[in-house]
């Protein structure tokens, strides 16, 4: 072999993460066979870098590890490793293709709003309740998409599912009959309380509008009487309904009562939490009654954790009490409890779950998947939206699974 000279290659080796860039000047010799009948040519080979590459092989792993950080976009990663955003995307697509994880006996389903196009508005997220890892994300929650997806999963695997945790969206509840023959539906207790809190909040907002309309009427009367605009201070009722609605909406056990009075600029005197509570409850005769009825369900929800049989006995009396009341909000709430009675009772079942500090006993809940959905929304916001669902799916699953598998 005869040397045909040395070529200097400029190689990016982004191992420095302190703002500096490491450039390797690689001297590569080219050889030619001295046999005139052969004239075979070859370059020197280096394990550090492949042919035609301007980045070392180590950069691929560094780039992939950075893709697990949902706070970094492709542009941020490219800037960090002194390369182009197209290169880091090609590296990701080369090594990452996330497959669906096997179904476990407790899975959670929920939607996340992506709005990529008409066929991908609400994506369906499936999560392993025990580990918290996402099993898969499907580009739509519509039946024409989910039906072939679940039907293609082997029946033996689907039959192993015992609990399907979701909110009160009826298509999710129907999955049990359609696809999971041995499972029961579980309606997350958070969504039940959310429904009640939302109804109470709407009651307070409507009450606030009534007081605002009263104040506006007073202002108009003053204007018609004196012929000029007159500034009216915010009324006590509007002030309390705007600033202290949490006295009704928050669970009483979580309220922090302060004995030490503080100066209130609106009332122009010192007042503590008990004073605010007294004024707030006096705004409308229903407020105290609503709080007592709400707290009754809160206590029922707390004391029966891990005891679905006792919850099944107590919920009937609650339904009767709410439905026979004269308050429309709680009549509707009682009808809601009656409609989803069995799935709500199933939410009191407790199972062992893997957490950051090890295994612990937990109620069946959609709380973990709500946290997971937040990460998908953050990823979408950081990337200013996505057009390629498959890339978004791979990025999301790769970043949120504890031990993702690389391909290649």
Question: Which residues are covered by each model-predicted region?
Answer:
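Core catalytic machinery and nucleic-acid-binding channels of phosphodiester-processing enzymes
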Residues: 27, 79-90, 97, 130, ...
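RNase H-like nuclease fold core
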Residues: 90-163, 168-175
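Acidic/histidine-rich catalytic cores and adjacent linkers
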Residues: 64, 92, 116-118, 139, ...
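Short, conserved catalytic/metal-binding motifs centered on acidic residues
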Residues: 33, 77, 107-112, 164-167, ...
């Amino acid at each position: 072999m005869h040397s045909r000279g040395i070529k200097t290659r400029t190689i990016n080796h982004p191992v420095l993460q302190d703002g500096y860039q490491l450039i390797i000047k690689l001297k590569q010799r080219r050889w030619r066979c001295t046999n005139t009948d052969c004239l075979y040519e070859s370059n020197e080979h280096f394990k550090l870098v492949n042919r035609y590459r301007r980045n070392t092989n180590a950069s691929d792993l560094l780039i992939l590890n950075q893709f697990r950080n949902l706070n970094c976009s492709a542009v941020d990663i490219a800037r960090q490793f002194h390369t182009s955003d197209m290169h880091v995307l090609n590296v990701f697509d080369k090594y990452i293709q996330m497959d669906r994880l096997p179904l476990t006996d407790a899975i959670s389903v929920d939607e996340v709003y992506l709005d990529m196009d008409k066929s991908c508005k609400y994506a369906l997220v499936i999560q392993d309740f025990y580990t918290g890892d996402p099993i898969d994300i499907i580009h739509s929650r519509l039946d024409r998409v989910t039906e072939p997806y679940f039907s293609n999963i082997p029946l033996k695997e689907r039959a192993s599912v015992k609990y399907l945790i979701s909110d009160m969206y009826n298509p999710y509840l129907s999955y049990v009959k359609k696809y999971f023959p041995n499972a029961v539906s579980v309606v997350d207790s958070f969504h039940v309380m959310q429904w009640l809190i939302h109804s109470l909040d709407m009651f307070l907002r409507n009450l606030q509008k009534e007081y605002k309309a009263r104040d506006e009427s007073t202002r108009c009367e003053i204007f018609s009487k004196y012929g000029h605009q007159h500034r009216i201070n915010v009324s006590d009722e509007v002030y309390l309904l705007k600033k202290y609605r949490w006295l009704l909406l928050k669970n009483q056990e979580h309220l922090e009562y302060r004995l030490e009075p503080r100066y209130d600029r609106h009332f122009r005197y010192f007042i503590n939490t008990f004073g605010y509570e007294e004024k707030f409850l006096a705004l409308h005769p229903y407020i105290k009654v609503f709080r007592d009825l709400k707290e009754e369900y809160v206590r029922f929800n707390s004391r029966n954790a891990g005891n679905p049989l006792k919850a099944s006995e107590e919920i009937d009396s609650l339904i009767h009490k709410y439905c026979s009341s004269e308050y429309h909000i709680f009549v509707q709430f009682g009808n809601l409890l009656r409609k989803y009675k069995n799935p709500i009772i199933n939410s009191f079942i407790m199972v062992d779950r893997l957490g950051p500090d090890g295994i612990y006993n937990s109620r069946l809940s959609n709380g973990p998947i709500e946290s997971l959905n937040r990460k998908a929304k953050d990823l979408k916001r950081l990337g200013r939206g996505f057009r390629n669902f498959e890339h978004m799916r791979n990025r999301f699953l790769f970043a949120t699974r504890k031990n993702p598998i690389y391909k290649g």
